[in-house]
């Protein structure tokens, strides 16, 4: 298993194809839905709760697909994409720790949007701290997160929940 503490875009895409941690590990989305360009820090003992943390980045470019359709004369990154990136990172963390199965977002406690990502921004940074890890019949990660644009916090989310399932047919 790859226990590196940072990952490039190429490695994240490899994860999306099931080839980073193994064919049965949780996958990241690929292509336009992958909202992460790199993970600059990941560990299993850091963060506010001492259970792990992740720092990741997305480079902003005016040509990103969502600026062309959200909205035509008022381009802004949809808030749901930032939230989804946070869930993506919780699932990635569980795969990095060795979980096997398919990742599914299970919920979030509270989300706050206090800013926006516009086409002239340069970089989004996601900072997650793992609050709880469950490795029983149900594998689940719970995290708190913030999203910054060019160093300014604009989103926060508490109790992001992601489960890892070996069978999703009854979902």
Swiss-Prot record:
It holds the Pfam family FabA. GO terms for molecular function: (3R)-hydroxyacyl-[acyl-carrier-protein] dehydratase activity; trans-2-decenoyl-acyl-carrier-protein isomerase activity. SUPFAM superfamilies: Thioesterase/thiol ester dehydrase-isomerase. It catalyses: a (3R)-hydroxyacyl-[ACP] = a (2E)-enoyl-[ACP] + H2O; (3R)-hydroxydecanoyl-[ACP] = (2E)-decenoyl-[ACP] + H2O; (2E)-decenoyl-[ACP] = (3Z)-decenoyl-[ACP]. The active site is at 70. Its EC number is 4.2.1.59, 5.3.3.14. Keywords: Cytoplasm, Fatty acid biosynthesis, Fatty acid metabolism, Isomerase, Lipid biosynthesis, Lipid metabolism, Lyase. The keyword Phosphoprotein does not apply. One of its GO terms (biological process) is unsaturated fatty acid biosynthetic process. One of its GO terms (cellular component) is cytoplasm. It is found in: Cytoplasm. Pathway: Lipid metabolism; fatty acid biosynthesis. Homodimer. PANTHER family: 3-HYDROXYACYL-[ACYL-CARRIER-PROTEIN] DEHYDRATASE, 3-HYDROXYDECANOYL-[ACYL-CARRIER-PROTEIN] DEHYDRATASE. HAMAP family: FabA. Necessary for the introduction of cis unsaturation into fatty acids. Catalyzes the dehydration of (3R)-3-hydroxydecanoyl-ACP to E-(2)-decenoyl-ACP and then its isomerization to Z-(3)-decenoyl-ACP. Can catalyze the dehydratase reaction for beta-hydroxyacyl-ACPs with saturated chain lengths up to 16:0, being most active on intermediate chain length. Belongs to the thioester dehydratase family. FabA subfamily. This is 3-hydroxydecanoyl-[acyl-carrier-protein] dehydratase. It comes from Shewanella loihica (strain ATCC BAA-1088 / PV-4).
